[in-house]
Amino acid sequence: MRNAAQLFLMFITILTLPAIAGAQVYAGGDAPRRGSFEAAGGGMFAPGFDMGSVTAELTRSTPTETFDLFTSDSEVSGFPGAFVRLGYYLSESVSVEGGFRYARPTLSVRLSGDAESAPDVTADETVSHYLFEGSALWHLRDLSFASGSAIPYLSGGAGYLRELHEGNQLVETGQEYHALAGVNFWLGSGQHRFGLRFEGGMSARKKGFDPDDSLRMLPVVFGGVSYLF
């Protein structure tokens, strides 16, 4: 929770920067309109999580008698990565977009409590994390600031999760759902222009290399550059 709070504070700080710089960089012009396309890309981060412990047991002659062989504890490091998206404006307030995320978190498995008193050992491997996503966005034009150049938005959608590990020999798949809030800060004027894009929110993942069948909620933040055309 402490990591989530730090990420939230960082996101709020980032959101305030465009308002401070607005007078220097905005030169006017209309906001995105129906038929506009928006291409975006940049970096992202989600914190790691603990996947819990599993004890390997040996069943003896009767089902009620078990013998603990060892215990394994698994955890995943943070998810620093990159994203790309392409969106289409259905109207001035509504757009849809498809995108792709890529990250390489580290999966750590610690073996302890060996029945034969072997020393504890930790094995690390890097996982290739791919996410193909689709979202719908509601652009809050009435809440724009910085002379209209900064337009907040809400976003929600789902994705297909694909994760490779064991030297990319094993493939795990799953689902992802997200609810985000962000801001587009457009630079200059005209139908073709660049902008800055920041957003944060919650991502719920299911399966992948995570053995838990329930949804796992994680905070996530994004920051990057957009191009309107």
Predicted regions and their residues:
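Transmembrane beta-barrel strands of outer-membrane/channel proteins
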Residues: A39-P47, G98-Y102, L154-Y160, V183, ...
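Cleavable N-terminal export/targeting peptides
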Residues: M1-R33
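Transmembrane beta-barrel architecture of outer-membrane proteins
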Residues: S36, F79-A82, H129-E133, G174-H178, ...
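Flexible, surface-exposed loop regions and adjacent strand-edge segments
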Residues: T55-T62, S112-P119, L170-G174, D212-L218
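Outer-membrane beta-barrel "beta-signal"
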Residues: E38, A136-L137, R216-F229
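Gram-negative (and chloroplast) outer-membrane scaffold detector with strong preference
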Residues: Q24-D30, R85-N168, G174-E176, G188-G190
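Residue-level signature of outer-membrane beta-barrel architecture
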Residues: F45, Y88, W138-L140, V183-L187, ...
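Short glycine/proline- and aromatic-enriched beta-strand/turn motifs that initiate or cap beta-hairpins
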Residues: G22-Y88, F222
